[in-house]
Structure formats: C-alpha cells, structure tokens
Amino acid sequence: MFATASAAILMLAACGGQATKAPVTTVGEGLRFCESTYPYEGGVLIANFGTEELNPLNGEGKGYIVRYKAGEAPQVVIPADGNLSAPKGMFLRDGRLFVCDVNKVVVYDLNQPGTAPQVVSFPEGELFVNDLAADGDVLYASVTNTGRIFRLDISDPAVVGTPEPWLEISGPNGLVIRDGAMYVASYPADGQTTDAHVIYRIADLSNPVAEPFVALPGQYDGIAFSGDGKSLYVTNWSPAGLSRIDLATRAVEPVAIELEQPLAGPADMTVADGVVYVPDLPNSWVVVFAE
C-alpha cells in the first residue's frame, strides 16, 4: 500500500485540558527525500529529490513530483525529466505548477503533460530557493542561503517575470500570505541557530518591514495556516517537531506526534480540507493526521 496506518498517535494538548489522541498515517512508498507538499485535487503534491543521498543543493536532475490522495494509488505527476534536482516549495496558478529548485524556479504546465517547462533562473549565488507564496499577480520566493525574498510578476503565468529582490531576512524559508500580511519561517542555512531565526511577520507588502512575530529561535522550515485561519502551524528542525501558534495571542503550543521513528526534519507542510501533511525530509515519508 502507498499509505500505511501506523500505531502512531497525535497528541495536541488543549489549554487547561487533557491531551487528545488521533491516529496518524505515514505515507512512504514511492517517496525519496520528500521536502515539500502542496494541496492538489483533494490530496497533495509531494516533491522528491530522488537521490541516493540527501543533498538539498544537488544537481543530479532526479527530482520528481507525486500526487497522494487517501484511498487512491499514487500518481507521478512530474517524472524525473532532468529539470528538477532538489524540488522544494510549490505554487499552482491556472494549471501551471511553480517548483522551487537550486538557483531557479521551474514552471510546468499541468494541462500539457510532457511539454518542456519554463525555467526561471535566479541571480548567481541565490541557491537555496525554498518556498513560494502569492499575493495577486505577485509571487514571492524565499532564498535561504542569502537571506533574500524575491518577487516575480505572474500576471501571465506562461511568461514569468524576472526575479527582483524585495526584502532581506535572516534565513527566509517557509512563506504564507493572508489578508495582505506575510509570515516567514526562518532557518539557518549554516545550521547555526541565532536570535534572528524566528517567525517573522510583514504586515504591509507594499512597504515591507519584517518584525518578529514569535521571538523563540529555532530552525523553522514549513509554515501553514490552520483550517480555521486562527493559527499557524510551523515545523522546526531543532528540536525536530511541529508547533501551533495562536495568531491572536502568539502563544506557541507544541503538537506532540508519537511515531515508531521520530521526526528528523519536518519540512514544507500543508493543511487542506481538515488534514495536516508534514513531510519528514530525512525519513522520506509524509506524516498525515486530521486537525
């Protein structure tokens, strides 16, 4: 089976109450170093490196994208065609799938499978292109190793604009946007966590100023809004785990996931239709549970 239900449980402690338990499913078959997920047709797309060894900056061209939906067989949506090496954050607009990769964003037309993708190159040295989020016709792309967020014109998704530097933040990784505000998960590209590696908020995209939203340092990777829009989920590599942030109070609540093999590197997560998908990059599986 593509997805196997394990004996794992999820425990989310309610404020002042007992921890609740829910079953957790692990999805592993057909995946190899899965860094990112994105909602798609009632399930998710899962981006895989496909390499023998884990290297987020590899250039082997073995990357591929799989569609997973509970109860259905897996489907390879984008095979290893040589254009993807370490695919990370994704974004979908008008049937075109934007995929972050090393020093570029690759754009596939899902309405025309097999056609050559558009490759949007980033400036030299902008290697760790990590995540994408859009506000209208502007697509934002984080580059973790240089501390920059770029903006791209996607008013015509078939002809994507040239990346333009927009804002600098220490280690920008995961991005989400809602109601005109951006939230950024910060990750140290060199593995050395500092006080600058926190969760940031940019309240006004037209006049961008990054302010710490949660000042607890970490190695933050994925970030997603909860289904009710009242919280943020964030993944952290050190310590490896998942937390939930109340947007009104900024209180941080750990989400305890008990697995036979613990999370090692939870990455670019998705929340869709009441289900949470957390890719665990080093373990090559996705942890799935209901909110």
Q: Model-found features: residue ranges?
A:
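A short beta-strand motif characteristic of beta-propeller blades
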Residues: 22-28, 73-80, 114-122, 159-167, ...
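Blade-level signature of beta-propeller repeat domains, shared across WD40, Kelch, NHL, RCC1
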Residues: 265-291
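Short loop/turn segments that connect beta-strands within beta-propeller blades
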Residues: 68-72, 109-115, 153-158, 203-207, ...
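Conserved beta-strand positions in repeat-built beta-propeller and related beta-rich domains
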Residues: 30, 45-59, 97-103, 139-146, ...
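Asp-box/WD-like beta-propeller blade repeats and closely related beta-sheet repeat scaffolds
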Residues: 104-106, 110-135, 142
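C-terminal motif of bacterial Sec signal peptides marking the signal peptidase cleavage site
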Residues: 12-14
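Beta-rich, blade/repeat-based domains predominating
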Residues: 30-42, 81-96, 123-140, 168-181, ...
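A short loop-to-beta-strand structural motif that recurs across blades of beta-propeller domains
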Residues: 56-57, 61-66, 104-106, 148-151, ...
